Amino acid sequence: MSRVCEICGKGTVKANRITRRGKAKKEGGVGKHITKTSRRRQKPNLVKVKAIVDGRPKRIKVCTKCLKSGRVERAY
């Protein structure tokens, strides 16, 4: 099963997790320094929804942004 919205195509994105050390400048230190970056994945907020597709009810994966904006016609 893919983690992709079937309406807008939003999927997983690669991002960095940044590890810092040191004391912040506003707290009287010399500033934060990056010691390590590691890759991580940001996943979309998907919901399985029964929606009307081509006039028939079908269960699809939709991101919550499409659901809130009204791009999906729900079938109850």
From Swiss-Prot:
Which Pfam families does the UniProt record give?
Ribosomal_L28
Superkingdom assignment: Bacteria
The record's Gene Ontology biological-process terms are: translation
Q: Where is the composition biased (Basic residues)?
A: 33-42
Q: Using the chain's own numbering, where are the disulfide bonds?
A: none
GO function terms (MF aspect) = structural constituent of ribosome
Q: What family does this belong to?
A: Belongs to the bacterial ribosomal protein bL28 family.
Q: Would you tell me the protein name for this molecule?
A: Large ribosomal subunit protein bL28
Give the organism the record lists.
Answer: Halothermothrix orenii (strain H 168 / OCM 544 / DSM 9562)
Phylogenetic classification of the source organism: Bacteria, Bacillati, Bacillota, Clostridia, Halanaerobiales
Q: Which gene encodes it?
A: rpmB
